[in-house]
């Protein structure tokens, strides 16, 4: 498939044009025209690029790409080396951030919920697009049991605050990645618990004082599954040779 056709295909699937983001979504670095082999991963790090080069990939598809609004526009240093490697090897780089977080089927929230047996997802925020969501545990469980479930599923021990929550978790808020700022909204919406990737100092106070359990399961760990699902969809529906490469990150 043509590289621009692939961009259009993913844009349409993820409804990228309907979501305001702080990074460009779509084809970020243009490479060869024809695409057959795709490497997917969470972040367009040098390690992922090197792996794609070793596999003779035509494209890299990630959740965390480049050209964030807060970063310098200069192509130098670490960013310069990464982009040079892409250009020299004629590899396309596609990045999809918030559209991949919120997609109801392939998104990070939806995929994490599926893995943790959380059903009936609903938006936490009012408006057309909600980044955080809430759902119901298929089987209510204690905070301790849910922490053990997270560790087993994600292969990572979560940071937890389970001091003042209810006896059993039924309703749980979800926002993968750096979503700790939504904990107060989850409390307002009557959630028994909130799971995200990161934690801030004030997050623990919010959990303690508002009486809900909090689980920080890792930015990388909670966002592996959306990009993986997107790649699997491309392989199944369009016949691409797709490989998900997990470049481990404890953060």
UniProtKB/Swiss-Prot annotation:
Keywords on record: Metal-binding
Residues the entry annotates as binding a divalent metal cation 1: 63, 101, 223
Entry-linked InterPro entries: DUF34/NIF3 (IPR002678), DUF34/NIF3_sf (IPR036069)
A GO CC term assigned to this protein in UniProt: cytoplasm
GO molecular function: metal ion binding
Residues that bind a divalent metal cation 2: 64, 219, 223
Keyword NAD annotated: no
A Pfam short name: DUF34_NIF3
Organism superkingdom: Bacteria
Family assignment from sequence similarity: Belongs to the GTP cyclohydrolase I type 2/NIF3 family.
Quaternary data: Toroid-shaped homohexamer. In the hexamer, 3 dimers assemble to form a ring-like structure surrounding a central hole.
Name the record gives this protein: GTP cyclohydrolase 1 type 2 homolog
Organism (species): Haemophilus influenzae (strain ATCC 51907 / DSM 11121 / KW20 / Rd)
């Amino acid at each position: 498939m043509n590289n621009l056709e692939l961009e259009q295909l993913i844009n349409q699937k993820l409804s990228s044009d309907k979501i305001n983001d702080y990074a460009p979504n779509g084809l970020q670095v243009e490479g060869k025209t024809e695409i057959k082999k795709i490497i997917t991963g969470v972040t367009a790090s040098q390690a992922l690029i090197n792996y794609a080069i070793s596999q003779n990939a035509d494209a890299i598809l990630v959740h965390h790409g480049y050209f964030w609004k807060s970063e310098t526009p200069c192509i130098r240093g670490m960013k310069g080396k990464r982009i040079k490697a892409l250009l020299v090897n004629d590899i396309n780089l596609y990045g999809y951030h918030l559209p991949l977080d919120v997609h109801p089927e392939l998104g990070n929230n939806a995929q994490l919920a599926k893995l943790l047996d959380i059903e009936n997802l609903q938006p936490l925020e009012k408006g057309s697009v909600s980044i955080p969501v809430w759902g119901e545990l298929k089987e209510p469980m204690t905070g301790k049991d849910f922490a053990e479930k997270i560790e087993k599923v994600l292969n990572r021990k979560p940071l937890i605050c389970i001091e003042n929550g209810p006896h059993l978790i039924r309703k749980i808020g979800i926002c993968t990645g750096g979503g700790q700022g939504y904990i107060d909204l989850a409390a307002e919406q009557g959630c028994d618990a909130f799971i995200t990737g990161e934690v801030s100092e004030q997050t623990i106070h919010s959990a303690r004082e508002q009486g809900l359990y909090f689980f920080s399961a890792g930015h990388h760990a909670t966002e592996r599954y959306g990009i993986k699902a997107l790649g699997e969809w491309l392989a199944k529906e369009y016949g691409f040779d797709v490989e998900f490469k997990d470049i481990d990150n404890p953060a």
